[in-house]
A protein has these predicted regions:
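An amphipathic, aromatic/His-enriched active-site/gating alpha helix that lines ligand/cofactor pockets
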Residues: 27-38, 63-97
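N-terminal first-folded block
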Residues: 4-43
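Glycine-rich beta-strand-turn "strand-cap" elements at beta-sheet edges
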Residues: 2, 42-55, 82-120
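Non-catalytic surface loops within mature trypsin-like serine protease
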Residues: 12-14, 66, 99-102
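Short acidic, gly/pro-rich beta-turn/loop elements at beta-sheet edges
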Residues: 18-20, 51, 70, 105
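Short, structured helix-loop boundary elements
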Residues: 17, 21, 57, 76-79
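Short, well-ordered beta-strand segments in beta-rich or mixed alpha/beta enzyme
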Residues: 3-11, 42-76, 111-112
Length: 120
């Protein structure tokens, strides 16, 4: 089964950005801790080409091991609580799901292969 990537773009009401950021960062941290199938959960701040932050916008990028992991995430009771808390802060939310078609191959040494003979 392919890995599943989820991108969510948020438009936030004026003056609610800090509150939103605190909630979504906590959600990301808890999801990574609670859900083994969540491989990555990044909170992103979109920027212009010159690096200037785009006001009232945030994004998340999530990576799940497979569709089963996505389904488990969707059934996590905490998700409904988080969505209810975020709802009043949002003007809009756009979700894009994608299957990973070219997974990165493991490179380098695995933790089991690390030892003093590799130091040199």
């Amino acid at each position: 089964m392919p890995q599943i990537s989820i991108f969510v773009e948020y438009e936030i009401h004026d003056g609610r950005g800090e509150e939103f950021a605190a909630l979504i960062k906590d959600h990301a941290r808890r999801t990574l801790f609670e859900e083994d199938g969540c491989l990555r959960f990044e909170v992103l701040k979109p920027v212009e080409a010159d690096g200037a932050p785009i006001p009232n916008r945030m994004m998340v990028s999530e990576l799940y091991a497979d569709q089963t992991a996505v389904d488990l995430h969707g059934s996590n009771p905490r998700l409904a609580i988080v969505r209810a808390a975020l709802g009043p802060l949002l003007k809009s939310r756009k979700v894009t799901r994608a299957e990973v078609i070219d997974e990165a191959e493991d490179e380098g040494l695995t933790p089991d292969e690390l030892n003093a003979s590799n130091d040199g």
